[in-house]
């Protein structure tokens, strides 16, 4: 598995839609963002889009792994690569938003992210179709953050 930084416009839309089902929202955060990919035999099997949202703060807008490649450590490897790259760019804090239940709760906690806010009704307001997971509609967004240590970037 190879991890690379790449133009976010070259990341497969179908893969980004795995994490964010609103193509219009994806199109809105791609310009000016950083793109990262996990490559297997030169095929993008994991993708991440992050962007600057404050002086030393970045947000991970999207991170996804192809469904047939999940549960193989690709997402965790990609996330580590992204965090290292953001630290090298001088980013001191990384934020992201997730649903309020599901696998992402433990996933991001394992990587050190902590909940710092709840945005009530976010998915009801910003998505035209209900977002469902395990038969339950996601309504609220959990805002999570991680402080990057200056030494997270490996030489």
Enumerate the predicted regions with their spans.
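Conserved N-terminal entry element of GNAT/NAT acetyltransferase domains
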Residues: 1-8, 142, 147-155
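Acetyl-CoA-dependent GNAT
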Residues: 2-66, 79
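Short hydrophobic/aromatic beta-strand or adjacent loop that forms the aromatic wall/cage
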Residues: 33, 138-143
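Short hydrophobic clusters on alpha-helical segments that form packing/core surfaces
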Residues: 60, 82-86, 104
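A short, internal acetyl-CoA/4′-phosphopantetheine-binding micro-motif in the GNAT/acyltransferase core
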Residues: 63-71, 99
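Conserved acetyl-CoA-binding loop-helix of GNAT-fold acetyltransferases
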Residues: 71-84, 110
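Conserved GNAT acetyl-CoA-binding A-motif
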Residues: 86-99
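Conserved catalytic-core motifs of GNAT/GCN5-like acyltransferases
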Residues: 95-97, 109, 114-137
């Amino acid at each position: 598995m190879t991890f690379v930084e790449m133009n976010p416009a070259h990341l497969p839309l179908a893969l980004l839609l795995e994490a964010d089902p609103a193509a219009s929202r994806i199109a809105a955060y791609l310009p000016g963002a950083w793109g990262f990919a996990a490559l297997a035999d030169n095929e993008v099997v994991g993708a991440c889009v992050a962007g600057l949202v404050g002086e030393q703060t970045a947000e991970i807008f999207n991170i996804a792994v192809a469904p047939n490649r999940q549960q193989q450590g690709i997402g965790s490897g990609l996330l580590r690569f992204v965090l290292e790259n953001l630290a090298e760019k001088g980013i001191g804090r990384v934020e992201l938003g997730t649903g309020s239940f599901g696998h992402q709760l433990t996933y991001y906690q394992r990587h050190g992210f902590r909940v710092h806010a709840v945005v009530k009704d976010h998915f009801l307001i910003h998505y035209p179709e209900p977002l469902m997971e395990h038969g339950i509609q996601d309504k609220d967004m959990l805002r999570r953050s991680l402080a990057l240590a200056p030494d997270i970037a490996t030489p």
